Amino acid sequence: MKKLLSVLLCAVMVLSLAACGKKENAPTPGPDPNGETEGLTVALVVAGKLGDRSVYDSSKEGLDRMVADLGVTPIVIECNNENHDIQMKNAAEKANIVVCVGWEFYNVETIAPDYPEVNWIWVDNATSAPVSNVLNITYAQNEGSFLAGYIAAAVSETGVVGAVGGEDADTINDFIVGYTQGAEYYGTENGKEISVVKNYSNTYDDPAVGKDCAIALNDQGADVIFQIASACGDGVFEAAKEKGFYAIGVDSDQKYIDPEVIICSMKKEVGSSIYDAVKSYLAGDSRFGTTWTADMATGYVGIGYGDSGMTQQVPDEVKAAVEELAAKIASGEIVVETTRA
């Protein structure tokens, strides 16, 4: 069945090229953009489990949009933080495109070549060298976190802001270095002494641990705390409500969870980025074999403040300053530090 499906898709591609002609140096063509997606299956494989109200849920929203707008057949696989390689292979046996969400799928570099008829999208990390059927999508979370740090420092009354990371790893620390730089930028700009404290939950799915981490930072004086720990962030929000400090959400606009304590969120538009990648592929603009950095200039990272009906703790003048900073980051006028090469 899978071989038949591949043959049919190839036939569509050949007919499309015959009708339109082939340009020199054109991107690798995909299926016809005019609705020829019947039978195209996209598998979403998440390293943890859905319900994180963050990256995984955002990726599922992107898949849902593909179903509604592009007519693909969806498969969803939750790894629950184990058996990542097995689940990648299971997905490849059933799908034409496999979207792997999480840095844990590093073996895609060796597994993808064994399934050359399948295209892969790896979210939140990149292969060490290009793989012809793998599109890496990395996010400039350091840039968005710079803005979050600036906001934290602007709102803080103690001059101490904090961050709870899921683990001491490059991806998480990329958030923290940007957050720290943004907080210090505000301090320098406004003559205010700012300190940044941090700790790590060393898990992503235990809100009780996240709560303990947040309380420990609050005990050090932090009155605004950035959660970068997936579902552990629920514990950070709970601690904020109990102890009377503010929190910043991550990856998705999380203000709706508790608008009274969550002042903003650092957003990574994971769902939109994978949707756009698949849509571009279907239109004949393939990026497989490359790494795509979704940065401030692309609009895939930024700040969310919830909707206008929610309590807004961030002053309008600070929001205006954040917009100016975002433009400077996008243009390269401000270069944000990173843990990534």
Language model feature labels by segment:
Residues 16-19:
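C-terminal motif of bacterial Sec signal peptides marking the signal peptidase cleavage site
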Residues 1-9:
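Positively charged n-region of N-terminal signal peptides that target proteins for export
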Residues 22-341:
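A residue-level marker of the well-folded mature domains of exported/periplasmic proteins
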